[in-house]
UniProtKB/Swiss-Prot annotation:
The protein's role, per its UniProt record: Nuclear hormone receptor that can act as a repressor or activator of transcription. High affinity receptor for thyroid hormones, including triiodothyronine and thyroxine.
Residues binding Zn(2+) 1: 50, 53, 67, 70
Cellular location(s): Nucleus
DNA-binding region of this protein: 50-124
A matching Pfam family: Hormone_recep
Residues annotated for Zn(2+) 2 binding in this entry: 88, 94, 104, 107
Protein name, entry field: Thyroid hormone receptor alpha
Lineage: Eukaryota, Metazoa, Chordata, Craniata, Vertebrata
Annotated PROSITE patterns: NR_LBD, NUCLEAR_REC_DBD_1, NUCLEAR_REC_DBD_2
Free-text comment about domains: Composed of three domains: a modulating N-terminal domain, a DNA-binding domain and a C-terminal ligand-binding domain.
Length: 401
């Protein structure tokens, strides 16, 4: 009886006998190592067989349809130049199938050659590494090309959306103090203001009443401008007065924070409030906002990388305004549809702008979440301030919203 060959790592124990030059199964307990199941290319027919051993084929390998086992055997044989060492005790007359394929390496190799497997397609290690690198480079190139193609084919705003975008942009520009000239017209809050906290807050922070007084002087016109912005939006003016009030109370601090954040100046490390007062982080913090100040400054620093234009800021404000989850709203569905209309026009405008920042649109939408959190934190902070600070310091409109 022939013993298993040590040359082929896939060799199996001998459990067949030779009759008339052909191998036959000796026992029904003979184990068959079939090719591993896995990804099968779409060009193969169902249950297509390996042309060498008849096992289930996995693809087109070295110019033939073969299984993984015969592919690996042929590759190792050529790479390690093993075929000169192969021999057959039965004059090369072995029948090769999935049961006997590991018993005679010479006949298996001859079968590989006879069915058309190409030796010249087997690469050595260095060529295989180079080929794999080339494949990866081509895959990465195709990925970039597809990404560019998808960006080019993303829809820009429709004519109706352009009209809406124009209205929202003009509403923002006409209610945004100092416009694009804010840097030239801003005045820095004196450094000695906001450095000497006097009134204590329950959370341990201090409030500089002089700085707080300065901020309250600009808060009323800032709130008025947010209200005017909302009234210039057609969808907002169509809502019941009760819903308009709820939406304005909910978004007022969020929109004012956004307007301040987009006027962050990294050189002076200041935010410009209401288009006129430039303040540092500690001044805003000691002036009553506490930790909310850090959130607004951090937002300003992150937004500076986005290079938002007036239209994008305006559409962000419209999305914040039309938030259907505000408590007490009557026309929830209508408001939700309004916000969806703004969001779709916003997304199409982002496509039109073609920003270089990867995943610009989802990253920008996350800023809406940040602004909502700032609004919620400010509401909580404001409740404490009403208790700790003299009531006469609060403007009536500020108390109302």
């Amino acid at each position: 009886e022939q013993k298993p060959s040590t040359l082929d790592p896939l060799s199996e124990p001998e459990d067949t006998r030779w009759l008339d030059g052909k191998r036959k199964r000796k026992s029904s307990q003979c184990l068959v190592k079939s090719s591993m199941s896995g990804y099968i290319p779409s060009y193969l027919d169902k249950d297509e067989q390996c042309v060498v051993c008849g096992d289930k084929a996995t693809g087109y390998h070295y110019r033939c349809i073969t299984c993984e086992g015969c592919k690996g055997f042929f590759r190792r044989t050529i790479q390690k130049n093993l075929h000169p060492t192969y021999s057959c005790k039965y004059d090369g007359c072995c029948v090769i199938d999935k049961i006997t394929r590991n018993q005679c390496q010479l006949c298996r190799f001859k079968k590989c050659i006879s069915v058309g497997m190409a030796m010249d397609l087997v690469l050595d290690d260095s060529k295989r590494v180079a080929k794999r690198k080339l494949i990866e480079e081509n895959r990465e190139r195709r990925r970039k090309e597809e990404m560019i193609k998808s960006l080019q084919h993303r829809p820009s705003p429709s004519a109706e959306e352009w009209e809406l975008i124009h209205v929202v942009t003009e509403a923002h520009r006409s209610t945004n103090a100092q416009g694009s000239h804010w840097k030239q017209k801003r005045k820095f809050l004196p450094e000695d203001i906001g450095q000497s906290p006097m009134a204590s807050m329950p959370d341990g922070d201090k409030v500089d009443l002089e700085a707080f007084s300065e901020f309250t002087k600009i808060i009323t016109p800032a709130i008025t401008r947010v209200v005017d912005f909302a009234k210039k939006l057609p969808m907002f003016s169509e809502l019941p007065c009760e819903d308009q009030i709820i939406l304005l109370k909910g978004c007022c601090m969020e929109i004012m924070s956004l307007r301040a954040a987009v006027r962050y100046d990294p050189e002076s490390e200041t935010l410009t409030l209401s288009g006129e007062m430039a303040v540092k982080r500690e001044q805003l913090k000691n002036g009553g906002l506490g930790v909310v100040s850090d959130a607004i400054f951090d937002l300003g620093k992150s937004l500076s990388a986005f290079n938002l234009d007036d239209t994008e800021v305006a559409l962000l404000q419209a999305v914040l305004l039309m938030s259907s989850d505000r408590t007490g709203l009557i026309c929830v569905d209508k408001i939700e549809k309004c916000q969806e209309t703004y969001l779709l026009a916003f997304e199409h405008y982002i496509n039109y702008r073609k920003h270089n920042i990867p995943h610009f649109w989802p990253k920008l939408l996350m800023k809406v979440t940040d602004l909502r959190m700032i609004g919620a934190c400010h509401a909580s902070r404001f409740l404490h301030m009403k208790v700790e600070c003299p009531t006469e310091l609060f403007p009536p409109l500020f108390l109302e919203v």
